[in-house]
Design a protein with these regions (language model features):
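Conserved glycine-rich beta-strand-loop-beta hairpin in the small C-terminal domain of fold type I
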Residues: 281, 285, 300-314, 321-333, ...
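PLP-dependent enzyme catalytic core of the Aspartate aminotransferase-like
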Residues: 87, 95, 337, 346-355, ...
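Hydrophobic residues in well-ordered beta-strands that form the structural core
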Residues: 126, 147, 201, 355-357
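N-terminal small-domain helix-loop-helix segment of the aminotransferase-like
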Residues: 2-106, 113, 287-290
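Helix C-cap/helix->beta junction micro-motif
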Residues: 31, 141, 194-195, 317, ...
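Conserved core of the PLP fold type I
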Residues: 67-192, 206-211, 215-221, 225
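Conserved core segment of the aminotransferase class I/II
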Residues: 221-301, 308-312
Length: 392
């Protein structure tokens, strides 16, 4: 008789953002006149930039022409996009060859899908709090998960301690906004090298880094090419949450069990993935053009300004917060010993603002909430005025 994957029973009943939506919907049904401002889920709100839109139109027209029509594309992505991504890394001082780039339809997928190529029952270390998909995907795979606690005491940047097979690092971190320095990443790289571990480095928010001394990629640090892969995405940097395009960097030097990891990943992709559409990749390529970079940078700046507006108000209220300098998120300590969900309920009831409870990102997130800057300036300013009126 067919059976379900028994590991599914070890998952929480709902994904974090499903619970948030249910609570929000219930509040709206009971308070139909409330003007809710959603600052929870990290979804962009600005439209795609003009250069990207024109590239998509042109690519779509090419698909309707017999001479320029394209069918299935390469599993790992078209060469034109891989070369553009390679050039992007050069601007960071990281040497990445086009054949080390593997284009996909989203980093969320890559986070989970890469587990297909590793042995079941692997020991996995994730920082806590962090993006829930790291935990859930490993629970589904039957892996053993350990936490490296990110707290105020360590500036939300835990350093190596326990040996593990796979290490997930996210910098800038989601949800805290904390960013590792080159020196700190070097310690993680040395730790992984000494223990035969693989680092899965999530750089989804690197476009929001302002500090010129902070690394945008783990491959800016010597030794990473032998112990790390990197995930990155066009979702937040270019507003592609509804378009879906990302990529993984797997260095040619990286081997596991005597096999080149890039070759193993490509074999996996050839079985379970048919590549990203030509129209989507043409759009991603356009976002990396000089004009595209100029336009997408304006959107990133817009969100960063939103973050600073909210962070300033939180500071004026006397609430500890971090993240707004190099991240689109503001990580806020709840007042009066409130739990994460209690502060969520308070903000929803008293200010009609939806945030994300920090406990949903892991045990160490208890007592915090995450506020997203992905919103209109108008809504951000209205939210700021509502927050100013709160009394704790």
């Amino acid at each position: 008789m067919i059976r379900l994957n028994p590991n599914l029973k070890n998952l929480k009943k709902n994904y974090l953002f499903v619970d948030i939506q249910k609570k929000t919907d219930k509040f709206i049904s009971e308070n139909p006149d409330a003007e809710i401002i959603k600052m929870g889920i990290g979804d962009v709100t600005l439209p795609l930039c003009e250069t990207v839109v024109q590239a998509m139109k042109k690519a779509a027209e090419e698909m309707g022409n017999k001479e320029t029509f394209r069918g299935y594309g390469p599993y790992e992505g078209y060469e034109f996009l891989k070369e553009a991504i390679s050039e992007k890394y050069k601007s960071f001082g990281a040497k990445i060859e086009p054949n080390e780039v593997y284009v996909s339809d989203g980093s969320k997928n890559d986070v989970a899908n890469i587990l297909d190529i590793f042995a079941k029952g692997s020991e996995v270390l994730i920082t806590d709090p962090v993006y829930p998909v790291y935990l859930d995907s490993n629970v589904m795979a039957g892996n053993s998960v350990k936490y490296a606690e990110a707290t105020k005491d360590n500036n939300f940047l835990p350093m190596p301690s326990e040996k593990s097979d796979i290490i997930y690092l996210c910098s800038p971190n989601n949800p805290t906004g904390a960013v590792y320095t080159k020196e700190q990443l070097k310690k993680w790289i040395d730790f992984a090298t000494e223990n035969g571990s693989l680092i899965i480095f999530d750089a989804a928010y690197e476009a929001f880094i302002e500090d010129e001394n902070l690394p945008h990629s783990i491959f800016e640090i010597e030794g990473a090419e032998k112990c790390a892969v990197e995930l990155s995405s066009f979702s937040k940097a270019a507003g592609f949450t509804g378009v879906r395009c990302a990529y993984m960097i797997i260095p040619n030097e990286l081997e596991i069990s005597g096999e080149k990891l890039g070759d193993v990943w490509l074999r996996r992709q050839s079985i379970k993935f048919n590549g990203v559409s030509y129209v989507t990749q043409a759009a991603a390529f356009a976002s990396l053009s000089e004009k595209g970079k100029e336009e997408t940078a304006k959107a990133v700046k817009y969100y960063k300004e939103n973050a600073k507006i909210i962070a300033k108000v939180m500071a004026e209220l006397g609430l500890y917060n971090i993240g707004s300098e190099n991240s689109p998120y503001i990580w806020v300590k709840a007042p009066n010993s409130m739990t994460s969900w209690e502060f969520f309920d308070y903000l929803l009831k008293e200010a009609n603002i939806v945030c994300t409870p920090g406990s949903g990102f892991g045990p160490s997130g208890e007592g915090f909430v995450r506020i997203s800057s992905f919103n209109s300036r108008e809504n951000t300013l209205i939210a700021a005025e509502r927050l100013k009126k709160l009394k704790f």
